[in-house]
Curated annotation (Swiss-Prot):
The species this protein was found in: Lodderomyces elongisporus (strain ATCC 11503 / CBS 2605 / JCM 1781 / NBRC 1676 / NRRL YB-4239) (Yeast)
Location(s), subcellular: Cytoplasm
Family in the record: Belongs to the RTC5 family.
Positions of transmembrane segments: none
A GO-annotated cellular component: cytoplasm
Record's function text: May be involved in a process influencing telomere capping.
Keyword flag Glycosyltransferase: no
Cysteines paired by S-S bonds: none
Highest taxon in the source lineage: Eukaryota
Protein name (Swiss-Prot/TrEMBL): Restriction of telomere capping protein 5
Length: 635
């Protein structure tokens, strides 16, 4: 079938017309009722009256501009055309472009093209971020006739919606061109992608709820943009672990690195949060779409202002009755008490929880972690770095836990002078030769190293036998994202954890350590994390080039780069160690009631001891064992 560009666009939109109507709160089917939306307007809408540091403000602007660049490129499907290469240029979307982009972002395009073309949106995203001005597949000619393939013949009486169902969307020329395109000729700019993933990670921290609450929490979390940015860079290092924060503008990501990174970990994170930003309207993207009428106003930027809103006043979409836009005062948009700024932890934050949540989703874990179902059980900085203290705090929790361990890479001075480290090193088997360089190209002496272990089963005293199941996994959080899942084995059955309170510490992916008289020795697995008994030093080991005699409990890295086949260790001095319980609201309430009861019992016992002290002292004085002056008696 031959038709013009606009006819093709018209065939796409009926498939999602009802969705778009409800989302945009359109009050008319008249195309003249809406106009364009600029990226600058969206940023202004969200930052109005909000105190955010200048760098965060600039990077949010860049992220929204990049988002609009991607949406504009996708929104011109099936005749995509890249806009200007200038990142600072304000990008505007028409309603038609917004609608078509939403078809892809919402995932509804799969109904049109089939699941075989699921990678198409990642190609569009990569091309849009690659800044290749020559990647326009079609002439910009509205009068040119295009041929579109059909599944079924078009009849004269068919409506546009019926015609859309008869089009073979998967057979479009653009799909063929994308399939044959050598994507490796393109290079993605990680500095652009970093701003976008920071926006997505911030969105990840916001649970699905009413729109006004989601937007309030988004605005609140903007104040910690730099924390989200730090973890976003760690996520991007999953694609290329050589990315440096100081030199991002001169670095690139290849299509191979990008596609493997997306497929192995990041695709669910990007897909879910891209949809949340646009479809759930966290950024209020659709609000500045407005009716063109005599009652509309103009603000100082040259954009029109929706009816009912005043210039310089923040607005949010009304949740019920679909009544469009309603003005709210700054007091009404302040974040409520339910928005927590921190967890009372030096290590764990809202941004870190969002980071872990995104990784667990990408791995396919059934365990969900949010700021609402996590409770701190142990913190070394509060309770002391003691194996007994750790044991007392975590053994009463009967749901999954997350163990965080963080510190600084061991330096040569510690190796040469710290006797406690030397004793630990003597009991931990060496793999590398003394003359080998222990640091790989992506490892630096000043690295902050952070690992997180997901323990699905309750903690057990395991001085003789390991415990655990195959849902256990190790997450590398800093300086780069990576993950190590439990190896499926009918023999091991995921029993890969020990908690040894008799002098050998904690092991994840290790065999039981030897601890007899003066003979102590660790047996680390090829992929393992070992924490010595004083909770002072830790070692993560990854042997990827060859198999050793050690039992393998965890799978090796699936990093797209050469890391999967590398032998390396992260040895670090522990500065923070925390354990957090993950459970339902019911489990949290039951655990809190149990802790409260135990505190009351402890206070009662202390009270009894104080009351009985007088009687006990009297007997001791009568026996002459304690003098009246309280300094002891004489015989």
């Amino acid at each position: 079938m031959s038709c013009f560009k606009q006819d093709v666009y018209n065939c796409i939109t009926p498939k999602t017309l009802s969705f778009v109507k409800s989302f945009l709160k359109q009050r008319s089917n008249d195309p003249a009722a809406s106009t364009h939306l600029s990226s600058a307007r969206v940023v202004e809408w969200n930052l109005n009256g909000i105190e955010v540091d200048s760098r965060a403000r600039d990077e949010l602007k860049a992220a929204v501009n990049i988002l609009f660049r991607i949406m504009k490129y996708i929104g011109q499907f099936p005749f995509p055309k890249l806009s200007s290469k200038d990142d600072s240029e304000i990008i505007s979307l028409t309603v038609q472009e917004f609608v078509i982009a939403s078809v892809f972002i919402s995932g509804r395009y799969r109904k049109l093209f089939g699941n075989d073309n699921g990678e198409i949106i990642w190609k569009f995203l990569f091309i849009a971020l690659s800044h290749q001005s020559d990647m326009n597949f079609f002439e910009d000619d509205l009068d040119h006739l295009f041929t579109i393939p059909l599944k079924y013949p078009i009849e004269d009486g068919d409506s546009i919606a019926i015609k859309a169902q008869k089009v073979d969307w998967g057979g479009l020329e653009i799909i063929k061109k994308l399939s044959n395109l050598d994507m490796n000729q393109l290079q993605l700019q990680p500095s652009l992608f970093l701003n976008l993933t920071t926006l997505f990670l911030l969105t990840e921290s916001i649970p699905n709820q009413k729109h006004n609450k989601m937007h309030d929490q988004f605005v609140h979390n903007l104040t910690t943009w730099k924390d989200f940015r730090k973890y976003s860079l760690d996520l991007l290092r999953y694609m290329n672990n050589d990315l440096s924060k100081d030199d991002l503008n001169s670095q690139t990501l290849s299509w191979s690195e990008f596609s493997l990174g997306m497929n192995n970990l990041l695709a669910p994170f990007v897909e879910v949060n891209l949809r949340k930003v646009v479809e759930n309207n966290v950024l209020n993207i659709s609000l500045p779409f407005f009716e063109t009428s005599a009652n509309s106003k103009m603000d100082g930027t040259g954009d029109e202002v929706p009816n009912g809103a005043t210039t310089g006043t923040k607005t949010t979409m009304k949740e019920n009755e679909g009544a469009g836009v309603e003005a709210q005062s700054k007091e009404e948009t302040k974040v409520g008490n339910d928005v927590e700024s921190s967890f009372g932890s030096k290590l764990v934050s809202i941004s870190l929880i969002a980071y872990i949540s995104s990784m667990l989703r990408g791995i396919g874990s059934t365990i969900e972690v949010t700021r609402f179902n996590a409770i701190k059980l142990f913190a070394g900085l509060e309770a002391g770095f003691s194996i007994r203290s750790l044991e007392n705090k975590i053994y009463k929790w009967h749901a999954p836990t997350l163990l965080f361990v963080s510190g600084k890479r061991i330096k040569q001075r510690t190796i040469d002078t710290n006797r406690r480290y030397q004793e630990f090193d003597e009991t931990y088997p060496k793999f590398f030769q003394a003359n080998e360089d222990l640091l790989k190209s992506w490892q630096y002496t000043n690295d902050r190293i952070t690992y997180c272990v997901l323990i699905n089963q309750p903690w057990q005293n395991s001085n003789k036998k390991n415990f655990g199941d195959e849902k256990s996994l190790i997450l590398s959080l800093e300086p780069r994202a990576d993950y190590y899942t439990s190896l499926h084995s009918e023999i091991l059955k995921g029993q890969l954890i020990y908690f040894n309170n008799s002098g050998m510490g904690l092991g994840f992916g290790n065999a039981q350590p030897l601890n007899k008289s003066n003979n102590k020795k660790y047996y680390p697995g090829d992929v393992s994390l070992t924490i010595e008994s004083n909770l002072e030093f830790a070692v993560f080991r990854h042997l990827g080039s060859l198999s050793t005699n050690a039992t393998t409990y965890f799978n090796r890295s699936r990093l797209p780069s050469t890391v999967a086949h590398e032998d390396f260790e992260d040895r670090f001095l522990i500065t923070d160690l925390e354990v957090w319980g993950i459970g339902s609201k019911k489990e949290l309430e039951e655990q809190q009631r149990q802790w409260k009861w135990e505190e009351q019992q402890a206070e009662a016992r202390q009270s009894v001891n104080i009351r009985n002290m007088g009687e006990e002292r009297a007997f001791l004085e009568m026996a002459g064992l304690v003098g009246n002056n309280g300094s002891g008696g004489s015989l």
